[in-house]
Amino acid sequence: NATDGIRIISYNVGRFSLPQSGEKLSRKECADSVIAFLKNEDADIICLQEFYTRNPEKVMAYLSDKMKGYDIKYYVNVTDKGCYGNVTLSRFPAIDKGKIDFEHSSNLALYSDYMLNGEPFRIYNCHFESYNISLSRLASSLEKDYRQTVRDTEAKMKKSIVRRPRQVDQVLKDIENCPEHTIVTGDFNDAPMSYTYWRLSRKRKDTFKEAGTGFGATFSKLRPLLRIDYILVPEKCKVLSHNIIHKRFSDHYPIESVISINNTDNERH
């Protein structure tokens, strides 16, 4: 019941590669563990990034079987490293669904429209460009060829620094043309001091700032320093709780927030 609060989860599942665990699980076993965890959490809206599959045609059947009662929107890009993308699951039936393809990138954003507590909302599930730098591989490469590694790392960072603001602008352009209230979630791959966060958090509440505690780190490899996953909600919403769930199915931690909607303010943004 939306009047009792809406529970939202955002989680970069890291392509089900389980990099931090000593357990030798296959991607399928890791995916099953993640889905079992999400099913147990029983959130109203679930936004996943870096959802990996070998067979895109089987994604809907797999999720429909494992997550009964959820409306499903997904899109995966086919790459030479496999098929991965975003998934949005909701207890509310979607009125409309779509995706925003980021230019020159396999990253993307999904959007889904719902009626929440009698009002129209659009949920954005975003995965913005990362630096594509593995800390463990970086350390190993520095030992072998310091200068070349520095050059390669600099090139990766420049590409990300250029692409991410453009991707943010694409989402903001869609928001500007959207008549509904908007909630922006996902893996921003950027810190709270960044352009990415500054632009997207304007006129929105950061659920961590409203109800979270501690540093709020969501990237486990640099805990407790790095918060790069967010749930941003309209100012009309009241944030009842925000939690970082320390499950190591991925190099990110899932974040979960419960919000309530105030019907007295009808301004859209």
Predicted ranges, named:
Residues 11, 49, 126, 185-187:
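Active-site flanking residues adjacent to catalytic metal/cofactor-binding acidic residues
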Residues 15-18, 51-57, 79-83, 106, ...:
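Active-site environment of divalent metal-dependent phosphoester hydrolases
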Residues 1-62, 80, 168, 261-269:
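N-terminal, active-site-proximal structural segment of metallo-dependent hydrolase catalytic domains
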Residues 42, 91-93, 179, 236:
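Residue-level detector of structured alpha->beta connecting loops
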Residues 1-5, 45, 49-136, 243-247:
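Structured beta-strand-rich core segments of catalytic domains in phosphoester-bond hydrolases
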Residues 26-30, 102-104, 156-170:
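Soluble or luminal CAZymes and related metallo-dependent hydrolases
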Residues 10-29, 132-160:
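Acidic/histidine-rich helix-loop elements
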Residues 165-182, 188-269:
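Metal-dependent phosphoester-hydrolase catalytic domains
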